[in-house]
């Protein structure tokens, strides 16, 4: 009986070790490396969208780093999008002189890219649902 139990334990260990060794060999023998694929949002992050606030695609939370923008001025910018140039943001109707001066002082922090459906669908730009 001891012989059978020892044989069973030895076979189990051998099979277990073969499983660990086999996985490494399978990974080492992969002929083609797996290349990461970029989706539309990841690809947009490699443009100015990743470094500046995109007036056509950024949500309201992206404006928190700019003094005096969050939430009122940021929501006006989002509601009046899309823009063709950064300077068009100065033409938003109903802006006060203070808001216009804040916009002018921060024009270098903005960029304009084509609106992306992945980033602008629904009301996610006003309420992105991050709590």
Swiss-Prot record:
NCBIfam families: PRK02515.1 (NF002708)
One cellular-component annotation, GO: plasma membrane-derived thylakoid membrane
Family: Belongs to the PsbU family.
HAMAP family recorded: PSII_PsbU
Chief location: membrane
Keyword terms: Electron transport, Membrane, Photosynthesis, Photosystem II, Signal, Thylakoid, Transport
Superkingdom: Bacteria
Oligomer status and interactors: PSII is composed of 1 copy each of membrane proteins PsbA, PsbB, PsbC, PsbD, PsbE, PsbF, PsbH, PsbI, PsbJ, PsbK, PsbL, PsbM, PsbT, PsbX, PsbY, PsbZ, Psb30/Ycf12, peripheral proteins PsbO, CyanoQ (PsbQ), PsbU, PsbV and a large number of cofactors. It forms dimeric complexes.
Propeptide: 29-36
One Pfam family hit: PsbU
Organism: Synechocystis sp. (strain ATCC 27184 / PCC 6803 / Kazusa)
InterPro entries per UniProt: PSII_PsbU (IPR010527)
Protein task: One of the extrinsic, lumenal subunits of photosystem II (PSII). PSII is a light-driven water plastoquinone oxidoreductase, using light energy to abstract electrons from H(2)O, generating a proton gradient subsequently used for ATP formation. The extrinsic proteins stabilize the structure of photosystem II oxygen-evolving complex (OEC), the ion environment of oxygen evolution and protect the OEC against heat-induced inactivation. May modulate the Cl(-) requirement for oxygen evolution.
Disulfide bridge map: none
Cell location: Cellular thylakoid membrane
Signal peptide (UniProt feature, chain positions): 1-28
Phenotype upon gene inactivation: Decreased growth rate at 30 degrees Celsius with 25 umol photons/m(2)/s, decreased growth in Ca(2+) or Cl(-) depleted medium; further decreased in a double psbU-psbQ mutant.
Protein name: Photosystem II extrinsic protein U
High-level lineage: Bacteria, Bacillati, Cyanobacteriota, Cyanophyceae, Synechococcales
Membrane topology: Peripheral membrane protein
Gene Ontology process terms (BP): photosynthesis; photosystem II stabilization
